[in-house]
Amino acid sequence: MPELPEVETALRGISPYLKNFTIEKVVVRQPKLRWAVSEELITLKNVKIVDLTRRAKYLIIHTEKGYIIGHLGMSGSVRIVPQNSAIDKHDHIDIVMNNGKLLRYNDPRRFGAWLWTENLDDFHLFLKLGPEPLSDEFNAEYLFKKSRQKSTALKTFLMDNAVVVGVGNIYANESLFICGIHPLKLAKNLTLNQCFSLVNTIKDVLRKAIIQGGTTLKDFLQPDGRPGYFAQELLVYGNKDKPCPKCGGKIESLIIGQRNSFFCPKCQKRG
């Protein structure tokens, strides 16, 4: 599933081809995604794009009339292609621009979404989101306060979008390993010092992943068709039974909150 670094990579890749250009039309070949494609988007024509931003794992395309909200789901990707490009099997949406290019959305599993709103402030999917992990609002004091009374496995806690958005499974695994904290540690047992370490590490891991263009394990591609190269930097994620890069012991895995978790039992003591 594309997480924050992958969505940020997508945003940076598509922005130069969309910002300050005009949408001529939107071609929807498959409207049945996680939620039906908004009717306002299907009928959108001759509207200028004034900005592109991101909130959590949502792409936000700002137009003169409102906002296109895109979510890549489990297997979605966006790319910029010439208007005469051949259509692949899972190319569900084209946003056709007045510069000879189009934004093409491909999604084999169709768990993504393309919606429309005229007001971001009360957009229903944004109302309960936590702070951005790279913002000043996400700090040790915030994490410490938020974790009190939470009898939840720490990795599950870090992946809760009401706590902090966009960390995701890969980056939670990597951050906990670097900090030497077991993924099953209860969130309420975090010390303030551990919160300082976790916050700084999460920010560092996410920034490095963005620089590398995200992580490609299966479906994700950057808008120019290249994979994300952070997969080559992964220390524990997907490395079950391989030697720990710190101690040489064997990396183990378990299921936490229905997600694969990878850790070193020697370097990440439970407690």
Swiss-Prot record:
InterPro entries for the chain: DNA_glyclase/AP_lyase_DNA-bd (IPR015886), DNA_glyclase_Znf_dom_DNA_BS (IPR015887), Formamido-pyr_DNA_Glyclase (IPR020629), FPG_cat (IPR012319), MutM-like_N-ter (IPR035937), Ribosomal_uS13-like_H2TH (IPR010979), Znf_DNA_glyclase/AP_lyase (IPR000214), Znf_FPG/IleRS (IPR010663)
Binding-site list for DNA: H90, R109, K150
Entries under Pfam families matching the protein: Fapy_DNA_glyco (PF01149), H2TH (PF06831), zf-FPG_IleRS (PF06827)
SMART domains: Fapy_DNA_glyco, H2TH
Known cofactor(s): Zn(2+)
Coiled-coil features, chain-numbered ranges: none
CDD domains per UniProt: EcFpg-like_N
Record's keyword annotation contains Iron-sulfur: no
Cofactor note: Binds 1 zinc ion per subunit.
GO biological process terms, semicolon-separated: base-excision repair
Reactions listed under catalytic activity: Hydrolysis of DNA containing ring-opened 7-methylguanine residues, releasing 2,6-diamino-4-hydroxy-5-(N-methyl)formamidopyrimidine; 2'-deoxyribonucleotide-(2'-deoxyribose 5'-phosphate)-2'-deoxyribonucleotide-DNA = a 3'-end 2'-deoxyribonucleotide-(2,3-dehydro-2,3-deoxyribose 5'-phosphate)-DNA + a 5'-end 5'-phospho-2'-deoxyribonucleoside-DNA + H(+)
Zinc finger (FPG-type): 235-269
NCBIfam families associated with the record: fpg, PRK01103.1
Subunit structure: Monomer.
Similarity remark: Belongs to the FPG family.
Protein name listed in UniProt: Formamidopyrimidine-DNA glycosylase
Organism: Haemophilus influenzae (strain PittEE)
Gene: mutM
